[in-house]
Amino acid sequence: MDGSGQQTDTMMSDAGAEQPPPAPQPVAGMDNIPATLSYGGRFIQYNIFGNIFEVTAKYKPPILPIGKGAYGIVCSALNSETIENVAIKKIANAFDNKIDAKRTLREIKLLRHMDHENIVAIRDIIPPPQREAFNDVYIAYELMDTDLHQIIRSNQGLSEEHCQYFLYQILRGLKYIHSANVLHRDLKPSNLLLNANCDLKICDFGLARVTSETDFMTEYVVTRWYRPPELLLNSSDYTAAIDIWSVGCIFTELMDRKPLFPGRDHVHQLRLIMELIGTPSEAEMEFLNENAKRYIRQLPLYRRQSFTEKFPHVHPAAIDLVEKMLTFDPRRRITVEGALAHPYLNSLHDISDEPICMTPFSFDFEQHALTEEQMKELIYRESLAFNPEYQHM
């Protein structure tokens, strides 16, 4: 589970239908978690799966565990001040690993900068009870019901309209992200959150980067199955087109209910791509370095498959759009604006309701090697922006 709280097997209503989302369900046997007041009643402690979960007192019981990941645990809770249910992610020992701490800081700063219906919102950064003992980070996000990965895996029926509406919302959110001079770099079904009203929100910006940056191999980028050829071939021609490739893979998986390119490793991943879209021509390889070109030339020659024959149940206009997204050469791949204006999305596209970010996001805070203490201070300041009353506590 990524970024926000989700649960499985949520029933999806017709696209756009007004229907309140179901309340998140507690994990079996965890519906009566005792709460202990701490720090003079300013905080509440819960023991969840043997982990201490400590939040400000405005988050009233009951608190419900809704997910667990490598980073820690996610619970839903009610903010008694705003009367809103939120998903609170605890990142345990958040500063032990510098790369992970930087990811957390990046996600917080990016999501606070962005304001869009198709991007998950941060509702709170919960301040630590003691500034000098700041080890765990608690981030409250708007609560969603499930994610696209869970829907694809379930036996939930999806109409053509559902798939079309989900694709439109992904592209609408991505247009805003790219307009902020940001690449998401890790788009995949589990990073696309949904509620029962079919609203879709993009989450998990921990790997996001500025569009002009080329030093991209410093961290793990894009889950392999959704990774474009230029990344698999270590190209330095690194543009917003990487996200478009991922969207093409996601949309195909949504319609076919199985991953398009489930590669076991880099080599297998590239082979699966070539088997579908064919070996690129010399012109299509122009952007690659000589090593990458040499590597492709020594591979078997693959003929392009017919997308129409491979996906006979898919609307021809959808096939045309997918082919434009899954173009080998990133310079020729359709842009997010081009995809939104494609005939397949005619019934949904409305340029006056597809806002852009007016202020490009600045990654200046990453220009210097931050110490653990500096990262703590920056995240602490973010928490005070939500909780100014804790400034002098």
Swiss-Prot record:
Stretch list, region Disordered: 1-31
GO biological process: defense response; intracellular signal transduction
Gene Ontology molecular-function annotations: ATP binding; MAP kinase activity; protein serine kinase activity; protein serine/threonine kinase activity; protein tyrosine kinase activity
Induction info: Induced by salicylic acid (SA), fungal cell wall elicitor and wounding.
Alphabetical UniProt keywords: ATP-binding, Kinase, Nucleotide-binding, Plant defense, Serine/threonine-protein kinase, Transferase
InterPro entries from the UniProt entry: Kinase-like_dom_sf, MAP_kinase, MAP_kinase_CS, Prot_kinase_dom, Protein_kinase_ATP_BS, Ser/Thr_kinase_AS
Enzyme Commission number(s) from the entry: 2.7.12.2
Protein kinase domain mapped to chain residues: 60-345
Reactions accelerated catalytically: L-tyrosyl-[protein] + ATP = O-phospho-L-tyrosyl-[protein] + ADP + H(+); L-seryl-[protein] + ATP = O-phospho-L-seryl-[protein] + ADP + H(+); L-threonyl-[protein] + ATP = O-phospho-L-threonyl-[protein] + ADP + H(+)
Polar residues: bias regions: 1-11
Residue numbers covered by motif TXY: 218-220
Binding site for ATP: 66-74, 89
Regulation: Activated by threonine and tyrosine phosphorylation.
Keyword Transferase carried by entry: yes
Pfam family, one: Pkinase
Residues of the active site: 186 (proton acceptor)
This protein's GO CC annotations: cytoplasm; nucleus
Subunit: Interacts with SIPKK.
Assigned protein family: Belongs to the protein kinase superfamily. CMGC Ser/Thr protein kinase family. MAP kinase subfamily.
Known function: Phosphorylates myelin basic protein (MBP) in vitro. May be involved in disease resistance.
Name of protein: Mitogen-activated protein kinase SIPK
Organism the protein comes from: Nicotiana tabacum
